């Protein structure tokens, strides 16, 4: 088994922040400069739909550490109504973030548009997108089973709204905020459980703590958004895979540089630390309201099994749960997850996908509606080459690509190219750490 040591200096730029920087740039007044923008398929899909609506977008490719490519992006806009009617469907490809958040901007435009995507995205629920926009006065049509395509007849007279999120969702919070920027009055988005707060930080929105423990994001209507520069830090969700590799591999020690350490994104690190993982955060600083730092991880053979059930922790670490499950199973032979039904509505049904593939490599699992448990290993461990189904989901593919480095059999992952959605240089970085 290989040992993994060294530094990762070119983590993929954070997808969540990059999406928002581009979308905010499209409604800002002036020129928005974004440094370290991602070349991954999802973020490029956001730039693509902006260009299809007439927004001027320019990209400059730069060669960074290890020869990997980063990008600077410049977006020119003239305020809320800079967009023009697209000539055809706006293709979001596999990016649910693009589809959901851009819908908030399209709802305020004086034209009709339609958001579509690949076969996976077209199966994902969009009722949570349509509902608040309809309440604000936009005409939104979905398929008969409330999935994409999302057809929007916008209006320049959106009504302000007080909207309580039915489930924690930073994407729905952001789409309502982007729509409410155009509305004729002040709006509020109310959260019972906190979700990613990048949109609030980037727009400088006020957040009020309510007496019952909830919080309210305040969005002023029709207040000009001045253009400003954004720098995209490293994606903590991508860092999770490197961290898992370091924790699982004997003798390994890895430093991941310039990671976004926003507390709404690092719940998974708290889960790992609570289980005895050797992880430390160093060189902490702040940029654009975001906490950034370096993460040091060492092989942790004494880790305890992970158990995740707190709804707030689930919401905070929803994207990292597949990797956490695979990590815990490989390290300890056990894992527990509850209150995570939302995982069934991601790029794949991630509960079933993880269970299926863990069973293929010799683990015993119990699956239920809102989670699953790994209860041990089968009496007979598979040998030779084992087929792993990525379910066309980048996080499933990467989770089992990490497992492939530490399990006794060879894993053959279907459609591994889907990893390019969020981490184009995944395999190159992994191999650069191998000693």
From Swiss-Prot:
Disulfide bonds: none annotated. It holds the Pfam family EPSP_synthase. Keywords: Amino-acid biosynthesis, Aromatic amino acid biosynthesis, Cytoplasm, Transferase. Phosphoenolpyruvate binds at residues 15, 96, 124, 171, 350, 395. One of its GO terms (cellular component) is cytoplasm. Its EC number is 2.5.1.19. It catalyses: 3-phosphoshikimate + phosphoenolpyruvate = 5-O-(1-carboxyvinyl)-3-phosphoshikimate + phosphate. GO terms for molecular function: 3-phosphoshikimate 1-carboxyvinyltransferase activity. CDD domains: EPSP_synthase. Belongs to the EPSP synthase family. Catalyzes the transfer of the enolpyruvyl moiety of phosphoenolpyruvate (PEP) to the 5-hydroxyl of shikimate-3-phosphate (S3P) to produce enolpyruvyl shikimate-3-phosphate and inorganic phosphate. This is 3-phosphoshikimate 1-carboxyvinyltransferase. It comes from Chlorobium phaeobacteroides (strain BS1). The lineage of its organism: Bacteria, Pseudomonadati, Chlorobiota, Chlorobiia, Chlorobiales.
